[in-house]
């Protein structure tokens, strides 16, 4: 009986050490998730500033379209796609952190169930109190992660909507650029025709 109680106490001590490790892992995941959240917030601010920049520089872009419009539009389009892709990668990383926390809690509950069964042979009240404290703390951290996840879902949705609007603006600018090129081509042809007519008239007058 003495050996059995000693073994149970040893197991309880091992469980407490694992709980501390799990708590440290959960804290690390929360810190990483908070960093991801800050990055997404910064990207949202950058994405929100894009429409204002397009409105302020609309006339400049029309002037620039006379020179290298296709290259400029392609560069802007590539930057937007890169931002959207990075947002999606951040969201995937957050989901992985949530899955890791759920796995930690699952193992934690299993260990505590084993400890509660062992409680029949020895009083494990201090360990159970530690379980309640750690469980509440980890549950709170999971709630925080879920809240961050919801914020990031909304941020990704807003980024998608913003991307569609910017795509429409780019398409409109490309269409305007095409029309300007056509007008320029027509004007050049008309000018050339007038020039040729003038030369023919002058030639006939000399004769």
Swiss-Prot record:
Q: Which family does it belong to?
A: Belongs to the SIKE family.
The record's subcellular location field reads: Cytoplasm
Q: Per UniProt, what is one GO molecular function of this protein?
A: protein-macromolecule adaptor activity
UniProt-listed SUPFAM superfamilies: Spectrin repeat
GO process annotations (BP): negative regulation of hippo signaling
- For this UniProt entry, what is the primary localization, expressed as one broad class? cytoplasm
Q: The organism sits in which domain of life?
A: Eukaryota
Q: Which organism is it from?
A: Pongo abelii
Q: How does it assemble?
A: Interacts with IKBKE and TBK1 via its coiled coil region. Interaction with TBK1 is disrupted upon viral infection or TLR3 stimulation. Interacts with CDC42BPB. Interacts with SIKE1 which mediates association with the STRIPAK core complex composed of PP2A catalytic and scaffolding subunits, the striatins (PP2A regulatory subunits), the striatin-associated proteins MOB4, STRIP1 and STRIP2, PDCD10 and members of the STE20 kinases, such as STK24 and STK26.
Gene for this protein?
A: SIKE1
Keyword Coiled coil part of the UniProt annotation: yes
Gene Ontology cellular-component terms listed: cytoplasm; FAR/SIN/STRIPAK complex
Ranges in a coiled coil = 70-102, 162-193
Q: What does this protein do?
A: Physiological suppressor of IKK-epsilon and TBK1 that plays an inhibitory role in virus- and TLR3-triggered IRF3. Inhibits TLR3-mediated activation of interferon-stimulated response elements (ISRE) and the IFN-beta promoter. May act by disrupting the interactions of IKBKE or TBK1 with TICAM1/TRIF, IRF3 and RIGI. Does not inhibit NF-kappa-B activation pathways. Associates with the striatin-interacting phosphatase and kinase (STRIPAK) core complex, forming the extended (SIKE1:SLMAP)STRIPAK complex.
One of this protein's Pfam families, by short name?
SIKE
Q: What protein am I looking at?
A: Suppressor of IKBKE 1
Q: Which residues are listed as membrane-spanning?
A: none
Which key words are in the record?
Answer: Coiled coil, Cytoplasm
